[in-house]
Amino acid sequence: YRPLRSTFRTKGDICMTNKRLRLTPSEINVVMSMRNNNHNPNNTLLIPDLHCPFCHDDALTFCKDMQEKWDCGNIIFMGDILDNHYSSFFASDPDGMNGGEELERALSQIDGFYEAFPEAIVLNGNHDHLPNRVAFKNGLSSKWIKTLDEMLNVPGWTFKDEHWIGNIKLIHGTARVAHTRMKQDLCSIISGHYHSKSYIQYLQGHNSRHFAMQLGCLIDRNAYAFAYSKQFPHQ
């Protein structure tokens, strides 16, 4: 038996016992958190249209479960993280939330996703920038408008129009569905945008093979913002 030497604190609040560095409880928590979040960088979690504040109540839990299940080290939001129903070019529900209330609720939901996924790529969706289009249409200079990352206060997120993983092109999407873009761009495509379409199709040529993946969405289909699609044949 050999008694321990005295323990003391340094300016960095690090314990010293037998001249060996000891982490404080708070530092241990940081290290354990980093270890727990050390997912496989070769696996990517794709999070399709959220349309906050009208995303499904279980969307965040589902995404976190999928990250753990498939050990995903990369996170990509496929666009339309916001809905901006109040500023739609189409008729908005007069009994719905006003612009301020909708934004506050959306930011609250986004905070949950940012806490769960502090580093991510976010593809720009058509709904994300509806207020900018309204401002432009009415002659308001972009100098008066905050960018999306400034408004959301998510410094760990990178906003892009498209992203490539090898030879696979990821986009939010437009009126052209994924398999149409695959044939036009002659590359593999992963796309969001269409809430009622989810599939994988392939294109085989003599010297190449491509695929088109059309993702679904994580919306609450019963929310008033999606009343327009109630009668769609595909749900």
What are the functions of these language-model segments?
Residues Y1-I47:
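Acidic, histidine-bearing metal-coordination/catalytic regions of metal-dependent phosphoesterases
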Residues D57-D58, V154, L170-G173:
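Short gly/ser/thr-rich secondary-structure transition/capping motifs
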Residues N38-N40, E68-D71, Y114-A116, L152-N153, ...:
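Flexible, charged surface loops at secondary-structure boundaries
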Residues N43, E119-I121, T158, K169, ...:
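Conserved beta-strand segments of alpha/beta enzyme cores
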Residues G139-K169:
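Metallo-beta-lactamase
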Residues V31-S33, T61-K64, L107-I110, W157-H163, ...:
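A generic local structural motif
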Residues T24, N43, I47-M151:
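Core catalytic region of metal-dependent phosphoesterases/phosphodiesterases
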Residues W164-Q235:
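Conserved beta-sheet core of the metallophosphoesterase superfamily
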